[in-house]
Amino acid sequence: MAFARILKACKWGIAASIAIPAVALAQSHPEFVPLARVSAALYRPDSGPAPHIAFLVSHRTANNLNNIACKELAKRGFLALCWNTRFQNNEASVRWEDIAFDVKTTVDYVRSLPGITKVVLLGHSGGSPLMSYYEAVAEAGPNWCKGPDKLIQCTANMDFKPADGIVFPDAHPGNGVQSLRGLNPSVSVASDGTYKVDPTLDPYNPANGFNPEGASHYSKDFQARYFAAQSRVMNDLIAKAQAKMTLIKEGKSTWPDDDLFIIPGGGWSGAGPGSSDLIAMDPGIPELMSTARPEKLLKNDGTIVTEVVHSVAAPEPENAKANRTFERGTKVFTLKSFLSANAVKSTNALSGVDWCSSNNSTMCAVQSIKIPTLIAAMGAFHFIRDQEQMYELSAAKDKDYIVIEGAVHGYTPCKACEKTPGQYSNSDKNLFDYIQKWANARF
């Protein structure tokens, strides 16, 4: 069981931090750096000239001290700081509007280091809304995270200095969007605690197109009903959470500050297994798993072609079992962590997301980010179209979008996707070589 869970996590790259022995060889002497509420590991090149470019790598909750990116970037001549936020391994404690101050701490730190003249933010997975949130506020000012349409507004004084560049390797649109698309709208819990499933909306019902042995194929009709139902469920959850917060403010709740907020069928509280996102079972849905137009594809041999790119992601039928469990299929938040970091308004989970209703939104933030921007989608995962859309929305004049052939979410080769052994063997090398060339050409 434990081994299977590690394999699953590696597929997601949730635990780009799991492979400790391999990553520990990133440099001879990585240095642990305590920075107030932030813990960090500083990676420098073992040889060559002293670096003048620093990369910052983090995730909103995951342990990133041994992230593969720091090893690979240090190996290519950069200084890299891999760090953990104050909310490490505690999804329920997240107060999103405070998290940008942790980015500020690390930006200020690396700018103080001798020889560092440029700072590049690297936002992968849950690090993408983190880094983009900071940068959007740094460039547009604190009014960016305020307003009547926001689920939660920032309130503190935010005096942030912009970075010099930002890289999004397999960024996702935001945790609220991930929660929305991962909801199982067929699930409900009766007042007596009974778990109920509506078979007409059940993504794990073979009558709806589910295949327990491989890739599922959901009809357009089912997809339309499903995406609409996900939106209704999320909006209902938001209304429920807001109503409970009102009771707390009125002194009519059990506790004076916060309360538990549980979402059955929502998937794991962190990223990864248990999600009922249709593309996890049916990787052939083009609206999410293909580019809308010809884009650059970095092939395994290092060449670049331009074509409509389709994800080669493997299906995850095992989510059917995980989604029915408490451990892997139930999100456990508090009212505040849900509303601030894991909710988003919408009219449709596919085509009607209100990107800027949440401050945890890469899609919203890129519209205010003007520093040089590199967006790199992994060709064997779920964010090819999302990242193409980030590129389209980006306010940067200097911006680039590319897909890395055969890479899973954690950058490494998708061996389960290969038709011939070694077909995607260079995926991680190709990604970091491309980042190296991109950064050196600009900074």
Describe the residue ranges of each PLM region.
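Alpha/beta-hydrolase
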Residues: 199-364
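Short beta-strand/loop motif that positions the catalytic acidic residue
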Residues: 369, 375-377
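Conserved alpha/beta-hydrolase
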Residues: 73-90
